[in-house]
Structure formats: structure tokens, C-alpha cells
């Protein structure tokens, strides 16, 4: 406390001229010098500090604006992605539904085609069996006829001797002769 009062008391006392010294005792320094230095610092530092604060404020505001724009862009992209997702889900459901219907329709078509093929094969089988049966019947008829002819020839050959043969020929000649007389 004494130092403070001493500094105010010694206002009228100036150090000798010709020497320049820094007074490191803050409480002993001249309040006028301090007020001048502080005034200069405030006057010049205020502009620099205001410029620094304004630049910082502008950077913060531009960062906030950029962040807001990015946020809006992200929200728009999210909405577009949601819309696309809904469309894709709807299309997937349609494809799934159409796929099930298509599978059932193809299954029915395949079953119908298989039934038709089986029916045609059954008809071909029946026709083939009928033709094979007819061929077998015709073959048996031919063999029976051939055997009957061979027996008849055998019977005729055994029954006919030369005398019967001549009588048959003479009888046929007489029949032909009488037919000629009728036609004349």
C-alpha cells in the first residue's frame, strides 16, 4: 500500500533527464502511461480484434450455411432413395406376384401338354396294336388259305387219276360244245 501512495506522491518528482529506464514495478509505474498504452492497445487492437472476430464469425456462418446445405442435400437424397426403395419394393412385389402366376400358368400348360402327349401316345399305341392285329389276322388267313389250297391240291391229286382226268376233260369239252350251239 505504501508503494501506491508513494507513486502518487512522487508525481511532482521526475527522474533526472538523460537517462531512460524501464520501471518493472507495475504498482510504481505512472498510471497515465499505463492508461495511454492501454488506450493505444484498445484503439488499434480493437480494429484488429474486430477484424479477427468478424472473419471468424463469417467462417463460422459459412460453415453453418454449408452444413445446412449439405444437410438439405442429404435429406433430399434420403427422400429420393426412400422413393426409389418404395418403387423397387413395389416392382419386386409385382415381379414376385407375376412370377407366381406365370409359374402356375406354365405349370398348367405343361400338365396340359403332357396330358395331350400321353393321349396322342395312347392313340398311336392303339392304332399300332390294331394294325398289328390286322396284319397278324391277314397272315393267319393267308397261311390257312395256303394250307387249304395245298390240301385241296393234295386231295385232288390223290383222287384224280388219268381215267377221271380224261372224263372230266371230255365232260368240259361237251359243255363247251353245247354252249357253242346255243350261241349259234
UniProtKB/Swiss-Prot annotation:
Keyword Transport annotated: yes
GO CC terms of this entry: chloroplast thylakoid membrane; proton-transporting ATP synthase complex
Disulfide bonds: none
Signal peptide interval: none
Compartments reported by the entry: Plastid, Chloroplast thylakoid membrane
Keywords: ATP synthesis, CF(0), Chloroplast, Hydrogen ion transport, Ion transport, Membrane, Plastid, Thylakoid, Transmembrane, Transmembrane helix, Transport
Family label: Belongs to the ATPase B chain family.
Assembly information from the UniProt record: F-type ATPases have 2 components, F(1) - the catalytic core - and F(0) - the membrane proton channel. F(1) has five subunits: alpha(3), beta(3), gamma(1), delta(1), epsilon(1). F(0) has four main subunits: a(1), b(1), b'(1) and c(10-14). The alpha and beta chains form an alternating ring which encloses part of the gamma chain. F(1) is attached to F(0) by a central stalk formed by the gamma and epsilon chains, while a peripheral stalk is formed by the delta, b and b' chains.
Protein name in UniProt: ATP synthase subunit b, chloroplastic
Amino acid at each position: 500500500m505504501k508503494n501506491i501512495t508513494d507513486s502518487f506522491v512522487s508525481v511532482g518528482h521526475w527522474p533526472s533527464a538523460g537517462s531512460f529506464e524501464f520501471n518493472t514495478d507495475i504498482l510504481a509505474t505512472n498510471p497515465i502511461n499505463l492508461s495511454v498504452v492501454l488506450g493505444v492497445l484498445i484503439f488499434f487492437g480493437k480494429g484488429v480484434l474486430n477484424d479477427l472476430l468478424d472473419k471468424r464469425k463469417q467462417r463460422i456462418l459459412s460453415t453453418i450455411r454449408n452444413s445446412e446445405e449439405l444437410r438439405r442435400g442429404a435429406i433430399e437424397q434420403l427422400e429420393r432413395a426412400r422413393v426409389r426403395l418404395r418403387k423397387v419394393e413395389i416392382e419386386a412385389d409385382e415381379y414376385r406376384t407375376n412370377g407366381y402366376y406365370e409359374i402356375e400358368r406354365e405349370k398348367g400348360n405343361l400338365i396340359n401338354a403332357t396330358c395331350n402327349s400321353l393321349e396322342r401316345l395312347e392313340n398311336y399305341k392303339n392304332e399300332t396294336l390294331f394294325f398289328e392285329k390286322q396284319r397278324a389276322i391277314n397272315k393267319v388267313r393267308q397261311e390257312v388259305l395256303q394250307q387249304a389250297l395245298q390240301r385241296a391240291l393234295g386231295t385232288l391229286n390223290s383222287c384224280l387219276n388219268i381215267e377221271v382226268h380224261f372224263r372230266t376233260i371230255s365232260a368240259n369239252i361237251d359243255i363247251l360244245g353245247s354252249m357253242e350251239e346255243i350261241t349259234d
